[in-house]
Amino acid sequence: MVQCVRHFVLPRLKKDAGLPFFFPLITHSQPLNRGAFFCLGVRR
C-alpha cells in the first residue's frame, strides 16, 4: 500500500523533475521498483 501511495506522489514529481529523478529512485529501491511498475500498469 505504501508503494502505491508513493507512486501517486511520484508522477507529480516526475512532471517537475523529469525521468532522471524517477529512474534513480526505483533503481536504488528494488521493492519499490516492483510496486511502482505494478501500480503503473494498474493506473494505465
UniProtKB/Swiss-Prot annotation:
Pfam families: PyrBI_leader. Coiled coil: none annotated. Keywords: Leader peptide, Pyrimidine biosynthesis. It comes from the Bacteria. InterPro entries: PyrBI_leader. Disulfide bonds: none annotated. One of its GO terms (biological process) is pyrimidine nucleobase biosynthetic process. Transmembrane segments: none annotated. The keyword Glycoprotein does not apply. This is pyr operon leader peptide. It comes from Shigella flexneri.
